[in-house]
Amino acid sequence: MTKPIYTYTSIHIKEAFQFEQLLENIFNGMNVSYKRKSEYMEFETDKFTLICAPLFSNNCFPYKRCSCLILDLDYSRIPFAAYDKVDYAVENILHEIHHDTEVIDKNDFMKIIKKMYEV
């Protein structure tokens, strides 16, 4: 059985870095071994792969590969004038992913990880 591939995307790169730090803290706290790959800020564990990809990317490869898309969209942190641009980028991503791909938020992803590694 192949491991699921989760792709995380956010509006701001700062949020992606914060998500990475949070994930590393969770992995370390749960004693989960992982490997980091530099391309797309990628994490690999024994149970899944996570790729962090920018929302405004010309490279749709991370989205085509994913079995679950993690959208981290905090509209309160962007100017109202940029809403259409964000919506357009999200729609493009949703057209790139496989029709079976689940779309979740980062809180749901954290619950999935916790459940995966419960003893």
Question: Predicted segments — roles?
Answer:
Residues 1:
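GIY-YIG nuclease signature motif recognition
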Residues 6-10:
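Conserved RecA-like ASCE P-loop NTPase motor core of nucleic-acid helicases/translocases
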Residues 15-30:
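Amphipathic alpha-helical segments
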Residues 30-44, 52:
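Inter-Walker segment of RecA-like/P-loop motor cores
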Residues 51-67:
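Conserved RecA-like ASCE ATPase "motif II neighborhood" in helicase/translocase motors
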Residues 69-74:
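SF2 helicase catalytic motif II
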Residues 78-82:
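Conserved ATPase-coupling elements of RecA-like P-loop NTPase cores
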Residues 86-119:
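Intrinsically disordered, low-complexity regulatory regions enriched in serine/threonine/proline
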